[in-house]
Amino acid sequence: MSTNNQPLAFFYDRHATPSTGILQVRLEACREYAAELRYEVAGEWIDRGDDALSDDRRPQFDAMLDALAGASVDRTVLCLINGWDRLSRDPGRCGHFRYRIHMAGGWTETTTGEDDRPGSTRPRALTAFPFAVVPEAAS
């Protein structure tokens, strides 16, 4: 088991346009936030182009989720995003992506200090659609 008690942050973003200026601003905000809170950075995963516009096909999100799940075995892990809309602009789909992060063993946190960590007393955005584990219907 790891002796490092600092959370391991997995940066995620999506960007549809060829111009990357605003993407770099968002990633720099993640870097600064992680440094301020002393989070160790696992890496950056960015879905680009059509993948960034889809809520169904996110290969970089899936790769990040696999890495996050693997690391969650012996580390505290989180997905760090610049804002909730980096997952999806649709509140329901945003909740779906957050649920997947939760099921992989992590939580989601924004560079403005909002998170969905279980038991957290930090603020949550009103636009961060809540997720719930819904039991499967009996057959």
Model-derived regions: residue spans:
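Short, structured surface patches at the beginning of a domain
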Residues: 1-139
